[in-house]
Amino acid sequence: MLMTGARRAVKVPFLDLGPVHEPLKAGILADIAELIDSSAFTNGPALRRFETAFARSCGTRECVGVASGLDALRLGLLAAGIEPGDEVILPAHTFVATFEAVTQAGGVPIPVDVGEDDYNLDVSAVEAAVGPATRFVLPVHLYGQLADVRRLQEVAAAYGLTIVEDACQAHGAERDGIRAGTAGRAAAFSFYPGKNLGAMGDAGALVTDDDHLAGAVRALREHGQRAKHVHDLEGYTSRLDTIQAIVLARKLPRLEAWNADRRRIAAVYGDGLRGVGDLTLPPVPDGSDPAWHLYAVRTADPEALGRFLRTRGIATGRHYPQPPHLSPAWAWLGLGRGAFPVTEALAAELLSLPIYPGMAPAQVQAVVHRVREYFGDA
């Protein structure tokens, strides 16, 4: 079917936050004006209100706001009792911050391959990787798809491992009735601007049902203080900025609607792109309800498809073309090419298509049409 001139002109950025921010702008500005008048710039009522609301949203007792998702992971591991040299099993296919959190907390990352069925931790590989120094397992709910946490809980219980979740891309996602953030002892979330729940700068949070762990993270984020000038721990400066807490509090009530919008777009992509060319669509295991942070398709030459779409006004992304174990920063792990075949295949073949709340139906259809056009199936 030939496209009209109007359809040919449709531009699709990889991410457009305008539709999200425009209806919230007046309320956010009013809240910031109130903050200025109160001078409660750090650890004040606005922060506590957001922490309470986000904990309720996740289904946990506690939420501790921190400066980033990386800090949430790092401080969560420290508060959970990681010791120098403790091994932490984690997926080879992830953003590098997962590895950074482990080493910055004094641990040793033990990557394992991911499964073809969800691109997350292969639970069988986790069990095979457990050794005498293994203390933690760190599942990453990549692209908004939960790892198989029910099976992972069984393995962790059998070997005495502590689960700390990297839920930085999984706000509101569920699998087998388990909500992101509730599968382990603690979970880290990122509120980087492009996340399903995003701030207007860097921000993060740790959620948990463990009151002692939450108290330790509160101390760690504030120079190790449990009381003014009483430093029980060597800590950090990692507070969640109050202006970001204000932004997040305004956005949180809309998270479910925004996630529903992402699901709608994912469904259109699925209907329009299934069976096209050599594309493999994102796998969704039975019982999984992804948050669709990213919509990553597999193809033999993602760079070529990305270039084709770019010339037609459609932006794409790569998540992630270089696995951490093949990055110079992690050469000391001694894991060369071929160590994790599924991870390395995904790194070579994945291309992320635009998916975000407020994406117009014409934009979604334009993506479908142009991808089909590339494969000669328009």
Predicted feature residues:
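N-terminal "arm"/small-domain region of PLP-dependent enzymes with the aminotransferase-like
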Residues: M1-A40, P45
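PLP-dependent aminotransferase class I/II
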Residues: L2-R7, G18, A30, L47-A53, ...
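Phosphate-binding glycine-rich loop
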Residues: S38-E87, E100-A105, P111-D113, I178, ...
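Structural detector of well-ordered beta-strand residues that form the stable sheet scaffold
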Residues: V64, I89, I110, T162-V164, ...
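PLP-dependent aminotransferase-like
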Residues: L78-A167, E174
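Hydrophobic/aromatic ligand-binding patch that stacks against planar heteroaromatic rings
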Residues: E100-V102, V155, R179, N196, ...
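Conserved active-site segment immediately N-terminal to the catalytic lysine
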Residues: E165-G198, A227-D232
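Short beta-strand-to-turn element immediately C-terminal to the catalytic PLP-Schiff-base lysine
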Residues: F189-S190, G204-D209, A249
